[in-house]
Amino acid sequence: MEGMDVDLDAELMQKFSCLGTTDKDVLIGEFQRLLGFQLSPAGCAFFLDMTNWNLQAAIGAYYDFESPNINVPSMSFVEDVTIGEGESIPPDTQFTKTWRIQNTGTEVWPPGVCLKYVGGDQFGHVNMVMVRSLEPQEIADVSVQMCSPSTAGMYQGQWRMCTATGLYYGDVIWVILSVEVGGLLGVTQQLSSFETEFNTQPHRKVEGNFNPFASPQKNRQPDENNLKDPGGSELGTISKNTWGPAPDQIEQDQNGLSQNSVNLSPSSHSNNLSVVTYSKGFHGPYPFGQS
């Protein structure tokens, strides 16, 4: 009988130890936090259920059973290289967060690792981004597309590296965001993207004597002075240094119009301009009759 009392007392003590934290979600979250987010929620639930949802016993079981068999990768957070880091951002604005990380271990990372959201504010719908397997001591930048909350204030969230099997490793990466109506982070990143796009576009080769404000004739080569029609006949010659009557102008009709040439010679201009002379006459029909 006394043995039964001892067993009942032990069972009651076990139940009393779990009375303060009967919410399974709370226990799972606390289990994750104490392990430094090294185990997925499903893994935490497994150890808690195995120990009758006793948090202390579950942690002991995890270290006794899992730790000797786990080869955890290593990762160190190097720096935040986000464009405009430290600036506030307007509400409901897209932005990109970029972190520099390093594999500080002695082995290459396993395939399928990712940077995953683990707590706090998420900033958009993206909760993970795939990361390539880094060699030992290799450094890489990881970017995540985010969106600021719709209400002004201070926000924070946590991200961690995670293996394909759900094992978290490395430093916790914090996102601390100041949301203000007059924030400039979104504009800063847009201007930076425009500058990057402009610098990556191919540039045209411009000659030293090229004048962007001159007429097309000014930038042509000397051998482009003679103009010919598609049939090969010469239409005219561009004269650069003369402004006067065309040499082949022979006669004018009674109305002062020439049938054989067109001559432009306004007396009000004293500078040298180009003159186009048409050496071939126009041949009927004549809309006003032939003089």
Curated annotation (Swiss-Prot):
Start-end of Low complexity biased regions: 257-275
The GO terms this record gives for MF are: ubiquitin binding
Keyword list (alphabetical) reads: Cytoplasm, Immunity, Innate immunity, Nucleus
Which GO cellular component terms, listed alphabetically, does the Swiss-Prot or TrEMBL entry include?
A: centrosome; cytosol; nuclear speck; phagophore assembly site
Q: Which GO terms describe its biological process?
A: innate immune response; macroautophagy; negative regulation of defense response to virus; negative regulation of protein localization to nucleus; negative regulation of tumor necrosis factor production; negative regulation of type I interferon production
Which InterPro entries does the protein's record reference?
Answer: C6orf106_UBA-like (IPR039517), Ig-like_fold (IPR013783), N_BRCA1_central (IPR032350), UBA-like_sf (IPR009060)
Claim: ATP-binding is one of the keywords in the record: no
Give the location in the cell: Cytoplasm; Nucleus
Pfam families, alphabetized: N_BRCA1_IG (PF16158), UBA_4 (PF14555)
According to the record, the residues making up region (Disordered) are 199-275
**Role summary:** May have a roles as negative regulator of innate antiviral response.
What name does this protein carry? Protein ILRUN
Q: What is the originating organism of this protein?
A: Gallus gallus
